[in-house]
Design a protein with these regions (language model features):
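Acyl-donor binding region in acyl/amide transferases
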Residues: 17-20, 62-171
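Conserved beta-hairpin
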Residues: 30, 43-63
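A short, polar/charged loop/turn motif at coil->beta-strand junctions and beta-hairpin connectors
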Residues: 12, 24, 55, 83-85
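Short amphipathic alpha-helix that is part of the acyltransferase structural core
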Residues: 2-41
C-alpha cells in the first residue's frame, strides 16, 4: 500500500466557522455525539461549529442547572435573590466529532464567548463542568481561559437496571 500525505488537504482549526444554529439541529447532534446521549432542557443558545460547510461540533448554553452549587460564587449575602444570575450562562453541553481538527474545542469556545460578549453584553461570566469519569479533567476549558474552581468526586450519577447512567437531578 502507498499513502501520500497532502498537507493542503488538511484543514486547521482557524478554518472553522462558528454560528448560532436552531435548537432541533443542535439537540439531534448532541444526542448522537455527546457521550451521555442526552440534551439539557434549559439550553437556549446553540452554536454550531462548521468545517467546509459540515457540522462537526455543537456547544449548547443555558441558565445554570444547579444554582445551589453556584451560590458561593455569585451570591454571598442575598440568599438566592442575586440579580447576577442574569449575568451568567452555563455551557451545558459540548459535543464534537473527529471531523474537526486538533484544538477545535478551545478555538470554538473562544469564538462563542466573543459572540456572546458582543451580542449579549449583560453576560459577565460563563460556567461549565467537566466530567472526569467520561471526558477528561477540563484541560480544554483551562486552555480556553476558564478557571478551575474545584475538583470533586462525582456522586451524582447512578446506574439504572438497564445499564443507563443517569444524574440524580433527573428525579
Amino acid at each position: 500500500e502507498c499513502f501520500i500525505f497532502n498537507s493542503s488537504s488538511m484543514a486547521g482549526a482557524k478554518e472553522i466557522i462558528v454560528k448560532v444554529i436552531p435548537t432541533n439541529i443542535a439537540n439531534a447532534f448532541v444526542k448522537k455525539n455527546h457521550y451521555s446521549g442526552k440534551v439539557v432542557a434549559n439550553s437556549k443558545l446553540h452554536f454550531g461549529c462548521f468545517l467546509k460547510n459540515k457540522l462537526g461540533g455543537v456547544m449548547s448554553f443555558g441558565s445554570p442547572l444547579d444554582k445551589g452549587k453556584m451560590l458561593s460564587l455569585v451570591d454571598t449575602n442575598n440568599k438566592g435573590k442575586n440579580k447576577k444570575w442574569n449575568e451568567m450562562l452555563e455551557l451545558n453541553r459540548m459535543a464534537f466529532t473527529d471531523l474537526l481538527p486538533r484544538n477545535s474545542e478551545s478555538r470554538c469556545i473562544a469564538i462563542s464567548v466573543k459572540l456572546i460578549k458582543k451580542n449579549a453584553p449583560q453576560i459577565k461570566w460563563i460556567l461549565s463542568f467537566a466530567d472526569s469519569t467520561q471526558c477528561g479533567d477540563g484541560t480544554i476549558y483551562r486552555a480556553s481561559g476558564f478557571k478551575l474552581t474545584s475538583i470533586k468526586l462525582n456522586n451524582q450519577l447512578f446506574e439504572l437496571p438497564n445499564g443507563m447512567k443517569v444524574h440524580k437531578m433527573n428525579f
